[in-house]
Regions:
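Glycine-rich, basic loop-to-helix element that forms the pyrophosphate-binding segment
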Residues: 54-70
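Acidic donor-binding loop at a coil-to-helix junction in glycosyltransferase catalytic cores
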Residues: 159-171
Length: 281
């Protein structure tokens, strides 16, 4: 039977208490960012837990460390605030046996709190570019050998602790599609996550829109990115009203992000120029 391995990106861990907190019942790797550099192992309930502690920073870098140490057949991407349901491992392996052509499957996760409303999978369906940006990394299980064959890793420019605050999961999925991997949704809940608060979301502010522009440029090019920015605003105009910014101001900020991405210019060095103008500074 294929082996499932959970890859957890975490910080500041001193022990293996996350095994119980996350209800893990499979092999697991904790990529732990801290001030130390060390390697630990623990056997539990017939499974093996590994903890790789490094002084690196950035969620993409952390996930890549977990990928480097992984030896499972199916890899389940995770954050340390996820709690898995009983039988998640069996459910995931069963799903791959039912959809053998899939290189990766995207599952359902129950969200506790109102910060994020996750799109719910209702059927087994192929993921394409048009719907690829609807899913986060912690819903993804993927065949390790496919990632190796396609040389796919997480970006180190997007996500917590990097230049741009979010988007590493979107780029991971996009990269899989670009390199010909077959991704499907699967309508089974495998976990729940409390997202009453967020480690990176600080509201629909100038930096949010600047980083969105940079993400769309990273995924495509500056011309398609501008189109994606406009359609994003049109689809989410009710949400974006919370920003207090006009349509033109938001587009200008996104365009700054598109321009800044060419030289990996962060918001603090580029986007704030618009913010100052908006505030009359």
């Amino acid at each position: 039977m294929p082996k499932l391995q959970v890859l957890v990106a975490t910080m500041g861990q001193k022990d293996f208490s996350k095994i119980e907190e996350m209800n893990i019942a499979s092999d697991v790797i904790f990529a732990n960012q801290s001030d130390d550099t060390k390697y630990d192992e623990k056997r539990f309930d017939g499974y093996l837990a590994k903890m790789i502690t490094t002084g690196t920073r950035g969620v993409g870098c952390n996930r890549n460390i977990a990928l480097e140490y992984a030896d499972g057949d199916i890899l389940l991407i995770a954050d340390d605030d996820v709690k898995y349901i009983v039988g998640y491992s069996e459910a995931i392996l069963k799903a791959f046996s039912e959809v053998p052509q899939a290189d990766a499957l995207i599952f359902n996760i129950r969200t506790v709190g109102k910060f994020v409303e996750r799109r719910k999978n209702k059927q087994i369906k192929r993921v394409h570019y048009l719907n690829a940006l609807n899913y986060g990394a912690v819903r993804i299980a993927v065949k390790r050998k496919k990632l190796i064959a396609k040389n796919i890793k997480f970006t180190t420019c997007f996500g917590g602790g990097t230049i741009y605050s979010a988007g590493e999961d979107s780029m991971f999925i996009w990269d899989m599609l670009k390199k010909g991997m077959k991704i499907y949704t699967y309508p089974v809940v495998i976990a729940e996550v409390d997202q009453t608060t967020s480690s990176w979301f600080r509201g629909y502010n100038c930096k949010y829109f600047y980083d969105k522009g940079a993400l769309y440029c990273a995924l495509t090019n500056k011309w398609i990115a501008r189109f994606l920015c406009i359609q994003d605003l049109l689809r989410h105009q009710t949400l974006f009203k919370e920003s207090g910014m006009t349509f033109r101001q938001i587009i200008d900020q996104m365009d700054k992000g598109i321009q800044g991405y060419k030289t990996l210019l962060p918001y603090k060095d580029n986007g704030r120029n618009i913010e100052k103008n908006m505030l009359g500074g």
